[in-house]
Swiss-Prot record:
Keyword Signal: yes
GO term, biological process aspect, one: amino acid transport
Species the sequence originates in: Brucella suis biovar 1 (strain 1330)
Name of this chain's protein: Leu/Ile/Val-binding protein homolog 6
Signal sequence extent: 1-21
Cited InterPro entries: BCAA_transport, Leu-bd, Leu_Ile_Val-bd, Peripla_BP_I
Coiled coil: none
Length: 390
């Protein structure tokens, strides 16, 4: 009987210590190996930069980040890892998610696990509609693809062909650009959706030339595919023939610019963040994030989504006193406003999506020979038009 009583006491003690633990774990799922490892590296750089600046404590609670690797889009693996993080690791927050399908797969477990999800990259608009416990600190493809339609028209381009990768964000990009472009009087002469695995773009380039379009709107996921597409755009004579290229900023992320080189010069994109953004907050962030990532040339946009994601999570921890309460945590950040390295931002209280400036950028060459995204126009306080289109 005494042994049973002691065992029961031990179990109760463990449960009590878990309930009042002063360590709050954040589980981050992202690509930390494989072809998209640089994006996961940027997640970690942004998180490390935030914690270097703000410390690892919120009140009396110590914040611990636990990472899990999903090298490529894999919804089943992402869901399994999220369940493992919640059940075995005891994380109170899930974050990261570079790929939309991975984020979508995890949303069903949020309510059951009583954990919020902070999306640091995945850009399909509808993610936030899948659970009231989702908050996004990155961007959506609708948000970054809509303003570039106005830019194309201002450049005198009336006929455009759309070329996107055939998955959630690509379809969002196609729809966003078409809606804004046609509403303003432009014509999308053809819409091409390419398999994600496409690596030979020559046939696509021929279709673009044959279409009679004055410009091409393109969306591909950052990293290997963008390099091949941009090279084909130049090698097949589209750039030299005056067919202008317009895109959201995924196409010219900073870590790709050394490889893109002269091919990218003059390309116009609209995006929520450039490493070159001129503000005190960004200069401070870039200094810390470059230390964290090791190679300054590798710093890119997922880092700022992760940095701001940690800012939101710290606010959630503060609001809940370190206790596990997803509803209270999310409620605490609705309407939250702050000055991010990217500029002024806020969390929309209805959609739980980030409202932010979108910048028109042109790829330029600095005096030292490096390439960068030069901001030349600001579209202020952009919400997510994609949610209205659902």
């Amino acid at each position: 009987m005494k042994k049973i009583a002691l065992t029961a006491l031990a179990v109760f003690s463990l449960a009590a210590s878990a309930a009042y633990a002063d360590v709050v774990k954040v589980g981050v799922i992202g690509p930390f190996s494989g072809p998209f490892a640089l994006q996961g590296k940027n997640f970690k750089a942004g998180i490390d930069a935030y914690m270097a600046e703000h410390g690892n404590k919120v009140g009396d609670d110590t914040v611990e980040v636990v990472y899990r690797d999903v090298p490529q889009a894999d919804p089943a693996q992402s869901k399994a890892l999220a369940q493992e993080l919640v059940v075995k690791e005891g994380v109170q927050y899930l974050a990261g998610f570079y790929f939309t399908p991975d984020a979508m797969a995890v949303t069903p477990i949020l309510k059951q696990g009583n954990v919020p999800m902070v999306v640091m990259n995945a850009a399909t608009s509808s993610i936030v509609t899948k659970s009231p416990y989702v908050v996004r600190t990155s961007f959506t493809t609708w948000q970054t693809s809509t303003p570039i339609a106005r830019v194309a028209l201002d450049k005198g381009v009336k006929k455009v062909i759309s070329v996107v990768s055939d998955y959630g964000p690509g379809v969002d990009a196609e729809n966003a650009f078409k809606a804004a472009f046609t509403d303003a009087g432009g014509e999308v002469v053809e819409a091409i959706r390419m398999p994600l695995a496409t690596n030979d773009f020559s046939p696509i380039m021929q279709r673009i030339k044959d279409s009679g379009a004055q410009g091409v709107f393109a969306f591909l996921p950052s990293d290997p595919t963008t390099l091949g597409f941009m090279k084909a755009y130049v090698d097949n004579g589209l750039k030299s023939s005056g067919i202008q290229l317009f895109a959201p900023g995924d196409l010219t992320q900073e870590s790709d610019l050394p490889a893109l080189g002269e091919n990218a010069l003059g390309v116009l994109t609209t995006f929520h963040y450039a490493v070159s953004h001129d503000s005190p907050e960004n200069r401070k962030f870039v200094e810390e994030a470059r230390k964290a990532i090791g190679n300054p040339a590798e710093l890119s946009f997922p880092s700022v989504g992760a940095y701001d994601g940690m800012h939101v999570i710290y606010k959630m921890i503060e609001a809940t006193g370190g206790k596990k309460d997803a509803a209270k945590a999310v409620e605490a950040v609705k309407g939250m406003e702050w000055v991010s390295p990217r500029g002024p931002v806020s969390i929309d209280p209805e959609s739980r999506h980030i409202t932010q400036n979108i910048y028109l950028r042109e790829v330029a060459k600095a005096d030292d020979g490096t390439y960068y995204n030069k901001e030349i126009q600001t579209f202020e306080k952009q919400g997510d038009p994609g949610l209205k289109a659902q």
